[in-house]
């Protein structure tokens, strides 16, 4: 990352390039959330149409497994490419690929030709794109601002990400219910154009020192080495993995089943439930922006308590309002924890390693999610979904608090003398 003197526009916050990128990302992410909600709903319909309800949990998780396995194989390459090459071009190429996937699935839905294997194959192809997109997207934000504004920029980026959840799922619920699920995919394809335009206007990263440029050409293992040696970063990656194992499958994989089977919700009501989750996520992101570093550990512990309580509440909910309020609480807790974890990891990452460190942090999500999703889906097929939610709360509490008790006292984001050089 360049210094403020090398990047004058970054001396003020927010600057022009950062704002343009945020606008483009906001439009694109709204489309992505629309497609995500429609995808989960379409899978429930296809499973019911093909008489595969006995395997609904596993089939809901199968696309995530396909995507996650591909990303697990390619994430090191994606992180290295983000450090070595122009992140703008990497992101633009990924947008083009995702436009093609969205249009293809939309056409299959429109012609009534969609089957479960189409969704699984498309997810695997999207995994290739995401392997390169995620590290580049995470690493480009700190390059657009001065070093002292990195935490603010990451908080705004997370707030935009979560704010789109207020619009995307609700809009998708309306489109699916009124016009058909294919329109969520078509509009998602169109939304990528906004981000491509924004990326085209961003300045190139100024060259670093000779030493920094040499380090950018290093191996993918440098990211692992940094995280392993820096205890606060390691703690945050461990907490991200804990969320992936016990919380994200509930939000990403099991929510369509929960809404359709347990709450008897319509597509529009499913969209409103996701809107509740988005509202909580935005609230958590805004909290992070106003949080002093000294309060980070307390905020993480509070977020864990909120998330555990919300999972228990969801396991008992009997109506949409109850479930919606539980999702708000769950999202506040999770977004606070995940946002702080990503901020701390990015703050402590050397500029020349940021792409590879971002890939390691991303691994704690996409590396564990496919297996967690399959296990959760399988357990949902064997036991009642509500029992799975309760079990997730217990496991999340035990492992999460254990991590915080052992290494969580050093999560202020400040560099300690013994790790500053790592």
Model-derived features with residue positions:
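Helix-loop junctions on the cytosolic side of multi-pass membrane transporters
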Residues: 139-144, 181, 185-214, 404-418
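A single, central transmembrane helix in multi-pass transporters
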Residues: 26, 30-38, 42, 53, ...
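C-terminal transmembrane bundle of multi-pass solute transporters/carriers
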Residues: 61-66, 73, 77, 84, ...
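Transmembrane alpha-helix termini and helix-breaking/packing motifs in multi-pass membrane transporters
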Residues: 38-49, 106-111, 167-187, 261-262, ...
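Substrate-agnostic recognition of the 12-TM MFS/MFS-like secondary transporter fold
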Residues: 17-37, 63-101, 118-177, 236, ...
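Juxtamembrane intracellular "pre-TM" segments in multi-pass secondary transporters
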Residues: 2-19, 205-238, 422
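Extracellular/periplasmic helix-loop-helix junction of adjacent transmembrane segments
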Residues: 38-71
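Structural signal for membrane-spanning alpha-helices in multi-pass inner-membrane proteins
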Residues: 40, 102-109, 172, 176, ...
